């Protein structure tokens, strides 16, 4: 043996690591990262409770409550996994992933509700998502972002462009409702309902085409207009995350994405399945549950993110989340659900009531007015929040369809 030859080689001095142990360690680390990624994850304790109560058909009210609370953190985990996957997929594919899975919870809940024949819940939840984003989220952003500042400024042109597109989208959604409101009620209601169904399906196809063109505008032809907002998103989200230096692998993101989607589907099934019992036991109308309660499930994570971003004085990003979510609902989720109803032979229409139409018009008008000057303060947030509370109170006392039909028959 040569004198310079080491007694132990480097390979022998460090035993090879077991790949299985390394994989398990990485999986545990990813799980810890996901569990700490959102301040809402403490609600995960309700996931097993909701599944157990739903599987064994225990108290309907508790089943609804537990699954309602369970879906909130699951939606946050789903959004986190989608964002991680989008970051590694590039701008175009990543944007499409965010556009598709950004409203996954609303889609899952709505599809299950449609399959169970809960058309009224689906219609109300679509409208409720728009109202909560335009009034509740916007108001909270203005309040928490401006409580210690004289005023906050944001890109007036970008905000107005998004708001104008939202106004057009909401106007197109209201055309079938206006069509129905101008026609007399009587023996020909069945014939008129058929025409409204056909109009809703045609309108939905047009809106979805506009949505595809909007995605091309945002991700393709005018991508430069949104680059600054994307950079701000990465910067702010890295500061919000409790471990900004860690990121999920593509495999981990896919596993979490698929696993969370499956769990949300079970929770949503139990949630929707108990709505009728909750209506009977609490006296709440289906419209109120769909309009006020259900939208919180899918939007709570985005609401928290918007407020945290606004508190860091990133109002362009906060408005982008609030108005962008509204655009997703108006241009994609709502017309898509009409087509899903068409495929499964459920008459899902865009026929909102006159009162619902009025509230949506008020929400769009007020949100456009508040961002008109490119400045905001906490008092404007109070105005927006107060309007949302007034609308919620009105729908709390607004009778459901059965009550209205019985009143109409008695007259």
Swiss-Prot record:
Topology of this chain in the membrane: Multi-pass membrane protein
N-acetylmethionine sites (modified residues): 1
Main localization of the protein described in the UniProt heading: membrane
Entry keyword annotation includes Zinc-finger: no
Residue positions, PTM Phosphoserine: 13
Effect of residue 208 to P: In manganese-resistant mutant 1
Any Pfam family: Na_Ca_ex
Ranges facing Cytoplasmic side: 1-30, 83-91, 147-160, 227-252, 311-319, 372-380
GO BP terms in the entry: calcium ion transmembrane transport; calcium ion transport; intracellular calcium ion homeostasis; transmembrane transport
GO cellular component annotations of the record: fungal-type vacuole; fungal-type vacuole membrane
Cellular compartment(s): Vacuole membrane
UniProt GO MF annotations: calcium:proton antiporter activity; metal ion binding; potassium:proton antiporter activity
Residue ranges crossing the lipid bilayer per the database entry: 31-53, 60-82, 92-114, 127-146, 161-183, 204-226, 253-275, 288-310, 320-342, 349-371, 381-398
Vacuolar topological segments: 54-59, 115-126, 184-203, 276-287, 343-348, 399-411
UniProt similarity note: Belongs to the Ca(2+):cation antiporter (CaCA) (TC 2.A.19) family.
Function: Has a role in promoting intracellular calcium ion sequestration via the exchange of calcium ions for hydrogen ions across the vacuolar membrane. Involved also in manganese ion homeostasis via its uptake into the vacuole.
Protein's UniProt name: Vacuolar calcium ion transporter
